[in-house]
Amino acid sequence: MRRIPRWRTVGAAAVVALAVAMLVPATSNAAEPVNDDAGPGCRFLDVPVPASVLDEQMVPAPGANVLAKAVNPGKPDLTVHGRLCLPHDGQVKTVMLALHGITYNNGYWNVGFEPEKYNYSRYMTDAGYAIFAIDRLGAGKSSKPPAALVTLDAQAAMVHQLIGKLRHGDIGGHRFERVVLVGYSYGSATTWRETSKYNDADAIITTAWGSTFQNGPLLRVFSTFQPAQLDPQFRDRPPGYLTLGPTGRDQDYFYDLSNVDPKMLRYSATELDDTLTAGEVASFYPRFGAVPLGQVPGGSTELELPLPHQTKSITVPTFLVNGTGELFFCGVNQQHCTSSQELQRQESKYFSEAACFRAAVIPNSGHNLNLQRNAPFAFETMRTFADEVLGPDGDNLDHYRATCSGISGSHVRPGPARFGAL
């Protein structure tokens, strides 16, 4: 195992402050050549997106794309790398666009360890869905713009571009009629931000997330980051890119350790670790909480994440899945995740009725739902929601909208719409 899980203090405030200085250009890594994956119906793709997505910032940054172009001369577009998988017959109308969290890459959805159990992409293609699991900007084999420009808002703008390309047949030559955004952790933050602004997906599934968070555990994780250039694996990343320090991931903060295979812990540490940017850290607090830019709240603080004009503006069917052992987003002593009904009650007040908000809790699971022994149950729960809302053929949306309002929004009461796993 490459890293031993322990906590070490490195000053999280310094991480946030670092983003302000990270407008320094650095040589960008071009994405590696496209290769066919050994998995049936899967292939890796490099998708161009305009550098103008970097202009989308909480603090307006006009001309940010000009800086990105200067860093990567002759290539005006950024590149998003991802793995597109289709069902065996190749006939599908609904695609899932999957977004990983910080310090991960698309491998979170494409696990190679016991893939029949832990591989989300395989599970969903077997269920009839297509899936495009990407490396977000700054991670994996996607472009590495200047760190301060790779923020939550820029990631959301990039996802908006990809949704349009999936609908128009510009990714893999397949025109998809329906798109489901699926997020994990920071990928869920990106999903909420993108949808609150564009509402261009047909449904969203978010995992390991919530509308309030425990700041102490989050600061503990932030304190384990170090400059990526100190890690031999990431020494070519630009200044301002971060990764886990020598002590690695705090396993007790990411897993229910009573329900995880030790071999999975080793696999995750050696195969799935990746980078994040100081810009992503710095944009987290002010974008989702009433916190001034650059300020880090105290460790004992429980903060509400969404500003009213954000999640309240989501108008597509929304699903949130957390584990009972979620330490970051389930409140003090995980009180918000004692049951699916309690998580529904806690979270629905942050959404309008148009979101048809649903929530589910996975027992004996922590932050890394896809990597726990009961990952198949989490996958089944997400698939059941997708089946009810859309289905692989995308035909169920009108019916779902007509029946879901009974338990959505602030009106938490029994309604006619149900789904099996809950």
Q: At which residue positions do the language-model features occur?
A:
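Catalytic histidine-centered segment of alpha/beta-hydrolase-like enzymes
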Residues: 362-374
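Alpha/beta-hydrolase fold nucleophile elbow
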Residues: 171-185
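Short, surface-exposed "cap/lid" segments of acyl-processing enzymes
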Residues: 89-132
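Secretory targeting and sorting signals
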Residues: 1-30
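Alpha/beta-hydrolase
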Residues: 224-338
